[in-house]
Amino acid sequence: MTNLNEGGNIWPDETEDFDQAIIGDMMKQVNSVLVKTGAKALPIGSGATPTPGKRSGDLDMIIDAGKLINFFKVKDAKGARVELEQLFQQAGFDTKKTGTSVHVKTKVGGEAQQVDIMVVDNGETASKFHVHDLPKGSPYKGIHKQIMLADLAKEKGFKWSPYKGLVNRDTNELVSNDLENIAKQLIGPNATAGDLGSVESILAKMPSAKEIVDRQEADPNSAWNKKKIQTQENEIVNALRRI
């Protein structure tokens, strides 16, 4: 499965963890620069459903590569990322590029924050695959849901792409990018898009999927467990910073 965490902390000595209450202001700064392109950066992960009082190290966003390619008159997403970075630089923002992302430093409340903008095909559709409905206090994050979807897709003879949707395992052709249909394909005929919101909601609709969780939990070297450990460590570090 595609690695969803490309940037890490780009400016460790310059940006700060931030209260999710300011995400709206951060997004306004980003999208004010993008207005002329006709493309809009959309929040994903926890940024799509911010919780005031909860802190984040960065804001992840997705933007449609096709719209940028058309606006900048370049041949591919790589060229679009180059132009996108220059656009933000011209607007006075500090930037960096890594992988598929352009990183932008916003400034709200006198402090700097990191925004990671992933430039991907069909960005508006892809962003829906990264919006989660995690229960309060859940030990699982969005990445765990993505891993679970990938395992469910494999069991059904498909592949899961966090940017395209459900694809044919043999031909890589798109099977569906509609979450309602994907839920029915992976869970059952009575499933809905809402059942794909979290690990817990998948298990509630499909108890047999507990086998996937058990298998992942049993492997100490799995991405599933490594992400849980990393998340716990980050929460401890963030708590210490606030003391």
What residue spans do the PLM features occupy?
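Short secondary-structure junctions
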Residues: 36-44, 82-100, 160-162
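Well-ordered, non-membrane alpha-helical segments in soluble/globular domains
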Residues: 19-28, 74-87, 142-146
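NAD-dependent ADP-ribosyltransferases
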Residues: 1, 58, 83-87
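Helical scaffold of the NTase/Pol beta-like nucleotidyltransferase catalytic core
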Residues: 2-44
